[in-house]
């Protein structure tokens, strides 16, 4: 592509560097986190003084052509049911990543518990079917106008809720907003309390888990919403606010369909995160220009 070549600064074909040099330079750019730093600077320079209504968070799968790192599972020790015997001490349950993050103050501390190694992920899609993939996950926070503010890369086997607090914490530092919008995968009082602590209003969908009563209640609410939509009636304010969460799904679509994040051939978390960061930066600038015009 002659136009692209000239735009990149190479007038003649012979000026284009070799593939090996491209690879070395990209490795250096990835190590320096050029894309991530540029994205942070852009948000700081042009979006910091804007008040946004919503911050929607979600994670999307990132399939990779890489072998997953084997995780050694602890041998299961069967526990005796009932109360412990007199003088018997039982080991307390290991707290989840989210529970450990609750008492941490910095994003760096929180992310120290999150793995970036290639893993095997399993997620339920919008149709209720489970999808399995090898690779990682991209966790993003998006504000009004489909503008991504924060992006964090993790292994595929990391639960969405494990990156919720770092996302909220980082986004709150960068811009001002009112509502935190998240799906049922983030249903936790720890996340709600953290959001309120930063003066936001959390709107998080309920995860029924194994409760039949909750499942029936959620189904009734969904049926009611459909009737309201058919009759074109005004729904509750919370429903209206929560429906804005679709903007994070649109950004995931832009990244994969328009900005080259659907097929990543690099290996290693640093390079993969850099590719995704360039995509996030492009979407951020593109959508910000739309908002201005």
How should each PLM-predicted stretch be described?
Residues 1-37:
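Short, positively charged, Gly/Tyr-enriched micro-motifs
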Residues 16, 20, 185, 271-275:
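An alpha-helix initiation/capping motif
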Residues 230, 234-293:
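Basic, amphipathic alpha-helical segments enriched in Lys/Arg and hydrophobic/aromatic residues
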Residues 184-257:
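Helix-centered, glycine/charged polyanion-binding patches within enzymatic domains
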Residues 1-2, 143-146, 260:
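Short connector loops/turns at beta-strand edges and beta->alpha or beta->beta junctions
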Residues 23-197:
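Polybasic low-complexity intrinsically disordered regions
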């Amino acid at each position: 592509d002659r136009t692209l070549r000239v735009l990149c600064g190479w007038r003649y074909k012979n000026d284009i560097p070799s593939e090996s040099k491209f690879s070395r330079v990209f490795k250096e750019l990835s190590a320096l986190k050029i894309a991530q730093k540029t994205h942070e600077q852009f948000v700081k320079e042009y979006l910091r003084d804007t008040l946004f209504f919503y911050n929607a968070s979600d994670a999307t799968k990132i399939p990779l052509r890489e072998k997953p790192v084997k995780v050694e599972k602890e041998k299961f020790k069967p526990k005796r049911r009932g109360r412990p015997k007199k003088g018997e001490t039982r080991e307390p349950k290991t707290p989840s990543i989210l529970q450990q993050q609750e008492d941490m103050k910095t994003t760096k501390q929180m992310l120290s518990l999150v793995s970036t190694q290639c893993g095997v992920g399993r997620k339920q899609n919008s149709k209720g079917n489970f999808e399995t993939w090898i690779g990682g996950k991209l966790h993003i926070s998006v504000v009004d106008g489909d503008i991504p503010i924060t992006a964090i890369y993790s292994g595929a086997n990391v639960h969405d809720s494990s990156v919720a607090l770092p996302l909220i914490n980082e986004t709150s530092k960068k811009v001002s907003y009112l509502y935190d919008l998240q799906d049922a995968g983030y249903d936790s009082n720890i996340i709600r309390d953290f959001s309120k602590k930063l003066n936001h209003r959390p709107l998080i969908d309920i995860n029924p888990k194994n409760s039949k009563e909750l499942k029936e209640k959620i189904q009734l609410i969904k049926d009611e919403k459909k009737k309201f939509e058919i009759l074109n009636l005004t729904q509750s304010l919370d429903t209206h606010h929560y429906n804005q969460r679709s903007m994070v799904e649109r950004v995931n679509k832009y990244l994969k369909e328009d900005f080259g994040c659907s097929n990543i051939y690099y290996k290693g978390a640093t390079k993969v995160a850099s590719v995704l960061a360039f995509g996030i930066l492009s979407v951020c600038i593109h959508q910000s220009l739309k908002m201005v015009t």
